[in-house]
Structure formats: C-alpha cells, structure tokens
Design a protein with these regions (language model features):
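Conserved, mostly hydrophobic/aromatic
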Residues: 3, 41, 49, 67, ...
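N-terminal beta1-alpha1-beta2 module of alpha/beta enzyme domains
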Residues: 1-75, 173, 348-353
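Short, acidic/polar
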Residues: 25-36, 94, 181-187, 292-299
Length: 353
C-alpha cells in the first residue's frame, strides 16, 4: 500500500489571517512539502497542473525537478498532466528528463481536467476534448514503448521513424490515467491495462465502487493480468491530533477552497452539516484523527481495492504549520499502521469485483 500527498498549488487567502501567497512563495512552500514527505518516508508526491492565476504551478515537471534535487526516494508525479492541451512529445521529454534528474522516480498521471482555462489558452475546443485526449494518449503510449516512433493521428503532426530523446532511466515512464466520475474513462484505463487514479472529492466512498468494477472488468476482459490493474485514490485531506480538532480547524479552509470566487463561478458553499456528513465514516472527505484516517483508508481499500492513497494536503490557504503537522501524522502514525495492516491482510473485496 503506497501513501502520498498531493498539491494542486491553489493560491487562496488564509481565512483566519487574510494572508495570500504570491506565486513564488507558494511554489517554494510546495517544494518544502515534497522534501518533508520524502524525509518522513512517504511514497509519492503529486503536483497538479493549472493555467489560471488562482494556482501557482502550470509546469509540474519543473517544480518536481526542484524537489528531486533535495530528495532521495519519494516518487514524483503530475496529478494530472492535462494531456488534451499538451504536446505528448514534449510531455514525455519533460518527464523523461525529470526521471534522469531524480534517478528513476518520475511518473505521469494523465487526465482530461475539470478546468477549462487550458483549453482556451492552447486553442483546444472543449467539445473535442475526449477525442483529442484519446489521440494524444495513443501517441504518449507509443513514445513510452519505442525509441524510434512512427505515428499518425488527427490532432498532431505525424512522426515517421523519429527518435525522441531523452529516454528515461526507467524502462518506461510509469503512466496512470486520472479519472473523475466518467465510466467511459474508467473503461478506457482498464482496456489499456493502465493503472488508474480516482479523484474522490465528494459524496460517499461506496458511490465510487461501480467505477472500480468497470475498470477491473474492462482490464480483465481485455486480457490484462490483475496485478497490473492498480487503483489509486485522491481526496481532500487533513489529519490532526484529535477528531474534533481536525474538523474545527479544517472546515474554514475547506469552505474557502470550494466556495465560488466569482458570481456564478465554479464551486459551491459547503455548510457545516454538509461538511460533517462528507467527513463521516463513509464520506469522501479524509479529515479527522490518525485512527479515523487509518480506518477510512482501510475501508476504501476494502470497498474499492486501492493500492495507493494520495491526500490533497494544502488546500484553501492552510498555513505551513498545519500542513506540516498533517504530513507528520500521516507519516508517523497513519502510514505504519496501514502498512502493517495491509501486509498482514491481502486485498480480497475490492479485487474480486
């Protein structure tokens, strides 16, 4: 069972102090979290890609390279690379370079994105985004598999026997597909035999089970062995010493993160009752004491069969002292218990869906 942390690099004012980071200080803060996660022994650090002033990071590979230079073992991944708006050749080159810098620790989570800014910026029609994604994913898979690439598609110029250096240190860059709630995306990941990451940001854990079932059924039906059909999960995350302390502290930041920032804008206002419900035993929100966190991740493993959990740890203007304490508790109290429990009890329920 792998455990890690995620930053989407949102830039929001701390609701308690009004403090707002500039992009540079926010990026340096994120680098410090990656270093802290490595020092604490976590497995994965993930970083999002966005293209608006509300977020600090538009190029995850650059920031991950900064983290790579100061770390030794933690795996470094995008979450997600917005493949529909990127050139797969450049994406592969960037992460192959990161793989060389990090001595074999780079990964890509490719997805379609729930944010529209990148589509306008890179002149991609959102109406075509699934077809564009499939086309570019096909090229990215070819780039992973071959040193000399011959490929043709609809949304990028063809390649005819071209070398695309550099090659990564790993035989192939690990590639996961990021999926929100779309059954067709889960089916695609399974048919391709790629590991899948589910983004669970609301509702009940059990509501995600059909996506896990679609994914594994598609993969097994396509002839892929069960062991390659790995499933990861991301969710909003905050752990503190006590259950009530975690909820009382986190709610203002969670509300700030999700509320619409402009009239009619993206997001929603989370009431205290809604927060309590989604933070409950089967709710998607991962906040509470270390023991509650352990219990919920084990429940997710039982219901969904997850191999990897990544918590989004720095949202809504959370100050570094709270984020660092959350990382510390994840690494020192949650992770050892989960590793012991999952080593002693192999998955059954989720894998047999």
């Amino acid at each position: 069972m792998e455990l890690g942390i995620l930053s989407l690099s949102d830039r929001q004012a701390d609701p308690a102090t009004g403090r707002l980071h500039d992009a540079g200080s926010r990026i340096r803060e994120i680098v410090s979290y990656g270093i802290a996660a490595d020092q604490a022994g976590l497995d994965v650090f993930a970083l999002g890609e966005h293209h608006s002033a509300e977020f600090a990071v538009s190029s995850p590979a650059v920031v991950l390279a900064a983290i790579a230079q100061a770390t030794g073992s933690i795996r470094l991944t995008s979450a997600v690379s917005v493949l529909s708006t990127l050139d797969p050749v450049r994406l592969h080159q960037d992460f192959a370079t990161l793989d060389l810098v990090s001595q074999g620790r780079a990964e890509i989570i490719a997805g379609r994105s729930a944010f529209l800014e990148a589509f306008e910026l890179f002149s991609v029609d959102p109406a075509d985004y699934d077809e564009v994604f499939a086309d570019k994913l096909d090229l990215l898979l070819a780039l992973r598999a071959q040193e000399q690439v011959t490929w043709s598609g609809k949304y990028r110029p063809s390649l005819d026997g071209l070398a695309v250096p550099p090659r990564p240190q790993q035989d192939r860059l690990p590639l996961w597909l990021g999926v929100g709630g779309t059954p067709a995306s889960a089916q695609r990941a399974g048919l391709l035999g790629l590991p899948m990451v589910l983004g669970l940001i609301g509702g009940d854990i059990r509501q995600a089970r059909p996506l896990a079932e679609i994914y594994r059924h598609a993969g097994l039906s396509a002839g892929h062995p069960a062991e390659v059909l790995r499933l990861g999960l991301t969710s909003h995350f905050f752990v503190a010493d006590t259950s009530q302390g975690a909820r009382d502290t986190f709610y203002p930041y969670y509300r700030e993160y999700l509320r619409p920032k402009t009239p009619g804008g993206r997001g929603w206002v989370v009431s205290p009752g809604q927060f309590t419900a989604t933070a409950g035993p089967t709710g998607a929100l991962m906040t509470g004491s270390p023991q509650e966190t352990i219990d919920k991740i084990l429940l997710e493993r039982e219901i969904l069969g997850i191999d990897r959990f990544i918590g989004q740890i720095d949202l809504g203007g959370l100050p570094p002292r709270l984020v660092n304490r959350s990382i510390e508790l994840l690494a020192t109290e949650v992770a050892p218990a989960l590793r012991q429990a999952t080593a002693a009890a192999p998955m059954t329920t989720g894998r047999n869906t």
